[in-house]
Amino acid sequence: MKSINDLIKENKFVSLPLGKKFSCAFKDWKPTKSGNGVLMQFNATEITTAKTYSGIMWLANNSVQNEEFDKTEKFIIETESELNADGYVVINMVD
């Protein structure tokens, strides 16, 4: 399996579709050089269609708050239906 550093070098950034819910596992993460967030290595499965996505995504600092993610835990996340003012997909953790 490729490391997060390999994926970054290969530019394997993935943008999840808007307005969808996913079962997601975060495999690894590292802070960005600029300190404005983290790069997350992930696998996600869209709940309604079972379509899978994998690669890396950038999460803003306010999305993560330096949380330690349990790499064995699955999370349910959802994307908002519109891009934010900066043109990024906003991802929310679902309780």
Question: Which residue stretches match the model-derived regions?
Answer:
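Low-complexity, intrinsically disordered/propeptide-like segments
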Residues: 10, 42-45, 62, 72, ...
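A generic signature of intrinsically disordered, low-complexity regions enriched in glycine/proline
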Residues: 50, 70, 74, 88-91
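OB-fold/S1-family single-stranded nucleic acid-binding modules
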Residues: 80-95
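OB-fold ssDNA-binding interfaces and closely related basic DNA-contact patches used
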Residues: 1-50
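N-terminal compositionally biased, intrinsically disordered segments and leader/signal-like regions
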Residues: 46-53, 73, 80
